[in-house]
Amino acid sequence: MKLDAPFNLDPNVKVRTRFAPSPTGYLHVGGARTALYSWLYAKHNNGEFVLRIEDTDLERSTPEATAAIIEGMEWLNLPWEHGPYYQTKRFDRYNQVIDEMIEQGLAYRCYCTKEHLEELRHTQEQNKEKPRYDRHCLHDHNHSPDEPHVVRFKNPTEGSVVFDDAVRGRIEISNSELDDLIIRRTDGSPTYNFCVVVDDWDMGITHVVRGEDHINNTPRQINILKAIGAPIPTYAHVSMINGDDGQKLSKRHGAVSVMQYRDDGYLPEALINYLVRLGWGHGDQEIFSREEMINYFELDHVSKSASAFNTEKLQWLNQHYIRELPPEYVAKHLEWHYKDQGIDTSNGPALTEIVTMLAERCKTLKEMARSSRYFFEEFETFDEAAAKKHFKGNAAEALAKVKEKLTALSSWDLHSIHEAIEQTAAELEVGMGKVGMPLRVAVTGSGQSPSMDVTLVGIGRDRVLARIQRAIDFIHAQNA
């Protein structure tokens, strides 16, 4: 049989990996980690990375899921050299190989009815035998190829399949455990396990990195690869990701979709850094640049044990990257969250200034956008607890006095604003907090914000003065 590569197979490329998700749902964190490990291994070895969409499940695959997967890969910045390739567009190729296998006696048509197969399974279960096809049709010459049938791969019956898993070591499966796999359905569509084999062959895949739930597929795929004379890639089956309670990761542990983490305010760098450490390590190092990941990553350092997802650790990493990445870069991601929350940022400080002001205070960009609304739009009410605590005593007098001094400023800058607040406190013979806290609630609506001088510069003179007057009126109304 001949190779039919969908792209030019550069003979100088010694490592070619692939990420091959099924578009039946979003890109979840387990799939994202698999994609990352596969991508890193290719980059570490100056190789190529292929994106393949395994959409043979026609009933469950959707264009929306495909778009979500590609969006997730792009957001994580895991670019591919080849693809995306779609299995549904390669059915002619798969059927060509199947027909050749039938001609060469490597596969055969099976005309058994569903009733016959159920009866066979029932008998085997009663006899406490492993359910498997009995090759009833292997030498059948009484049916026409035009009659309804499936095609089965003629699996070897002797010996074992042995492969050295790059993560788990030597794995051996007896061929007596394997059935004659259906490789083409009655409707003429090829099955998943077969399509994978042909694709890995045609695309020159040298290393298959995937979840441990695929281990049972591997011996079947190896036998087909051997039958058609294709090279056997190196397999690496990575462990599953559990929640922090040891149970399989699910929605009850929080977000499981990659794009949900984007929506929740995480930077892609934080999620990538977290995922790479979720089953792989390099000494005690926790923070990795993209370049360091590529330089250090090896499959034999990937853990065989399941990993536990810890949201607090992810938040810690996210805050690190919010602080350490250039404000211009963080601001681009922050802008999405303002739009998502319906906040118009056209009338207010530059988003880079917001990042600089709030980087130490916020764990997520969603929190940063939500907690900085007052820079761009008016708030409806004062926080009840903050107003009750700080709009009492001589708060109205302090606000009136500081408003007077702020109004008189010739320059609206940090130093001048700080001096105005300081002078107000001195003249009233009170601590800075007796002026600063009522002022904070007056201009932000809450008791939390960056330092007052920074906050007031960001909000702008006209808004600040109007909000102080509003607070004074509010206090008088409350005391009336």
UniProtKB/Swiss-Prot annotation:
Read off the CDD domains from this record: GluRS_core
Which residues hold Zn(2+)?
Answer: 110, 112, 137, 139
Q: Which GO terms describe its molecular function?
A: ATP binding; glutamate-tRNA ligase activity; tRNA binding; zinc ion binding
Report which reactions are catalysed by this protein: tRNA(Glu) + L-glutamate + ATP = L-glutamyl-tRNA(Glu) + AMP + diphosphate
The enzyme's main class, written as a single word, is ligase
**What EC number(s) does this enzyme carry?**
6.1.1.17
> What does the record say about how the cofactor binds?
Binds 1 zinc ion per subunit.
Where is the motif 'KMSKS' region annotated in this sequence? 248-252
Record key words, sorted: Aminoacyl-tRNA synthetase, ATP-binding, Cytoplasm, Ligase, Metal-binding, Nucleotide-binding, Protein biosynthesis, Zinc
One Gene Ontology term of the biological-process aspect is: glutamyl-tRNA aminoacylation
Keyword Ligase tagged: yes
What domain of life does the UniProt record list for this protein's source?
Answer: Bacteria
- Motif 'HIGH' region located where? 21-31
| Known cofactor(s) | Zn(2+)
Write out the annotated subcellular location. Cytoplasm
What does the entry list as the binding residues for ATP?
Answer: 251
Q: What's an example GO cellular component term for this entry? A: cytosol
Task: Give the quaternary structure.
Answer: Monomer.
Q: What does this protein do?
A: Catalyzes the attachment of glutamate to tRNA(Glu) in a two-step reaction: glutamate is first activated by ATP to form Glu-AMP and then transferred to the acceptor end of tRNA(Glu).
Similarity-based family:
Belongs to the class-I aminoacyl-tRNA synthetase family. Glutamate--tRNA ligase type 1 subfamily.
The protein's name is Glutamate--tRNA ligase
Give the species this sequence originates from: Haemophilus influenzae (strain ATCC 51907 / DSM 11121 / KW20 / Rd)
Taxonomy of the source species: Bacteria, Pseudomonadati, Pseudomonadota, Gammaproteobacteria, Pasteurellales
